[in-house]
Structures are given as structure tokens and as C-alpha cells.
């Protein structure tokens, strides 16, 4: 997941990703033209490293998008949705994305003061999700290894790739 607080560290964070990772370009505060330029730059940098690049939101950001995140209807490639509550899980059950990002699994700077998702809630989500669930929010490799036993399909983060959390 990208966001504005990554600043100039975005491309260093992409270098830290394991080969074959997915990158969701968000940066919602940018104008559409700026988001398109950023998306193209991320694609040029990430694609040779074997990464998928998905756009967040309804507006097309590039000619060749590997997928869409939180976009209404269908889009090119992989479709993913955010899931912060039961209403969003019900929405995912109706729209049938290929992946859900469940968040916040742990305390995170993206949701300051927000409570982490209780393990019982995550277990219930994993049981009822129509697709694979990606854990997001305060994630590290160690936390992901523990959650793998619960059945997560993978994990995502922001700060961990900036070197601000232990991996």
C-alpha cells in the first residue's frame, strides 16, 4: 500500500519488497494527473522487479493496470477490497473480489487511536470471506508468520517497508 507519508522513500520501499509482491497505488490527496504520473513511475520501477501494480479507486491511472483496489464494478486484472468492518465484508461477499485487505489487524499509524482487530474477529472474517484475506495494519514478517496459522493469504504494510518497524 502506498500513501503520502512515504514521500521520497516510496522507491526505496519498493526495493525492499520480496519479488512478486503487489503494490496498491493510493495517494488519494494527489490530483488525477499527479496520481497518473506516480502510477506510471511506480510501474516503470516495479514491473522489472516482478511486482504487480494495482490502482486504488475508480479512475484509471495507466494503460496497463494489473488490478484495482476499492473500485466499483469490474476492472482489469486482480480485484481487491478494503475490509474494516462487517458491512465491508458483506459488500465483499456481494462483489466477490479476489482478495480482501482486513485492517487494522494491529495498531497502526494509518488509523491513529483506532483499536486493533480482535483475533476472534479476524478468525470470523477468515471463515466468512469469499476469497483470500490479506492482513494489513501494523504488520511485520513475524506477525504474518503467526497469522499464517489462522489462514491469512498474505500480508501488507506501509511502515514496515519504510524501515520504521522490524520486519
What do these predicted regions represent?
Residues 9-10, 34, 87-91, 121, ...:
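Short acidic active-site motifs
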Amino acid at each position: 500500500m502506498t500513501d503520502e507519508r512515504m514521500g521520497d522513500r516510496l522507491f526505496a520501499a519498493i526495493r525492499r519488497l520480496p519479488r512478486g509482491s503487489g503494490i496498491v497505488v493510493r495517494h488519494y490527496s494527489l490530483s488525477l494527473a499527479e496520481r497518473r504520473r506516480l502510477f506510471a513511475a511506480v510501474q516503470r520501477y516495479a514491473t522489472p522487479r516482478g511486482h504487480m501494480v494495482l490502482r486504488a479507486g475508480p479512475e484509471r491511472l495507466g494503460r496497463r493496470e494489473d488490478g484495482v483496489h476499492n473500485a466499483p464494478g469490474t476492472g482489469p486484472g486482480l480485484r481487491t477490497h478494503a475490509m474494516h468492518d462487517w458491512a465491508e465484508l458483506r459488500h465483499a461477499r456481494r462483489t466477490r473480489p479476489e482478495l480482501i485487505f482486513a485492517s487494522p489487524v494491529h495498531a497502526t499509524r494509518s488509523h491513529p487511536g483506532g483499536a486493533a482487530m480482535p483475533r476472534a474477529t479476524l478468525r470470523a472474517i477468515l471463515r466468512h470471506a469469499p476469497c483470500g484475506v490479506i492482513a494489513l495494519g501494523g504488520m511485520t514478517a513475524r506477525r504474518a508468520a503467526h497469522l499464517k496459522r489462522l489462514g491469512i493469504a498474505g500480508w501488507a504494510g506501509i511502515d514496515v517497508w519504510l524501515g520504521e518497524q522490524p520486519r
